[in-house]
Regions:
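Extended alpha-solenoid helical-repeat scaffolds
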Residues: 2-14, 18-81, 86-89, 93-315
Length: 315
């Protein structure tokens, strides 16, 4: 088996280097805990010696960072590599930059000082004209920003809600949701922009906004009740197969969008007869069309029934 893996590794331009492959192989083949500890200790000593050296290529630096992550996965301290992780986030190569952001999110605890060092990098990457850099930075917002960093990044996140590219707008909505979870007052001045996202031309962007609005409505439902007619209209369009078939699952149109809409309607219609009356017809149609005998259909029916039990009764 090991020879087969060696042949595969040597025959491919794998994303991992030979040294890392040999490390994983050696640990996997170790006969005792003592032997495993010896291998890990030797690896740590090697990394501590080579990481401070200058002149590493981005590719080599990424591999060394990955090896330090592997050391941490095995229960050892890999903090000696954290500064190099921050450097990797500044790489001009998108793949290495993404690796740096991911490594930082996995290793730097919320109170770590190196997170503050990444704020400026995140801001610069969000302003990039490269879509992938922007989405990578927005992922960094979701994973690395803490409550005290929110004011520094929220302005750039809000601007990206109007980006030309759909994936960037979707990521921006997700990042804004995370900022709201960290600081509920941070989005208070941007409700109008959040409302406009519901009407985004890309259903995936609109779907990302539903989770944010659901949390906002749970905190103050009165601010969002006026969205009920729009949400009902969107739900009706979905069940009538007006969305692209790309959103279908087992011939059920956009089932996860349907379920998120139903959860939101349940919150907005609770104890409100006027709002609830706007929902009765579409809820009945949702249950009728979803009852197809497959699991995802049952999930939609369940959410619809739950919504019915939450809103004002139809008397």
């Amino acid at each position: 088996m090991s020879s087969l893996l060696s042949n595969i590794a040597s025959g491919l331009e794998a994303p991992i280097g030979r040294e890392f492959f040999d490390l994983v192989k050696a640990i996997g083949e170790s006969k005792s805990k003592q032997e495993e500890d010896r291998i890990i200790t030797e690896e740590i000593m090697y990394l501590k010696k080579i990481l401070p050296s200058n002149g590493h290529s981005a590719k080599k630096l990424k591999e060394l960072v990955v090896r330090s992550l592997y050391v941490e996965m095995l229960g050892q301290d890999g903090s000696f590599a954290y500064m190099r992780i921050v450097e990797l986030c500044a790489s001009n190569n998108i793949a290495y930059k993404k690796a740096g952001y991911l490594a930082a999110s996995l290793t730097l605890h919320p109170g770590h000082e190196f997170r503050l060092m990444l704020v400026n990098r995140i801001q610069q990457d969000m302003k990039s004209t490269n879509m992938i850099e922007s989405t990578t930075a927005l992922s960094g917002v979701c994973r690395l920003v803490t409550e005290d960093m929110v004011p520094a990044v929220i302005g750039d996140v809000i601007k990206l809600l109007n980006h030309d590219m759909d994936p960037v707008r979707k990521k921006a909505v997700s990042a804004l949701h995370r900022l709201y979870q960290l600081d509920k007052d941070s989005v208070a001045d941007h409700y109008d922009k959040i409302r406009r996202v519901i009407c985004d031309k890309d259903p995936a962007v609109m779907g990302a906004a539903l989770g944010l609005i659901l949390d906002l409505a749970k905190d103050d439902v009165s601010l969002w009740k006026d969205l009920v007619p729009s949400l009902v209209s969107i739900l009706k369009q979905i069940i009538e197969h007006r969305l692209s078939k790309d959103f279908d699952y087992h011939r059920i149109p956009a089932p996860w969008l349907q379920m998120n809409l139903l959860r939101l309607l349940a919150v907005l219609g609770r104890g409100d007869q006027t709002c609830s009356e706007d929902m009765y017809e579409v809820l009945a149609e949702v249950m009728k069309r979803a009852d197809t005998g497959i699991n995802v259909g049952y999930a939609i029916v369940y959410e619809a029934v739950n919504t019915v039990t939450c809103i004002y009764p139809n008397t």
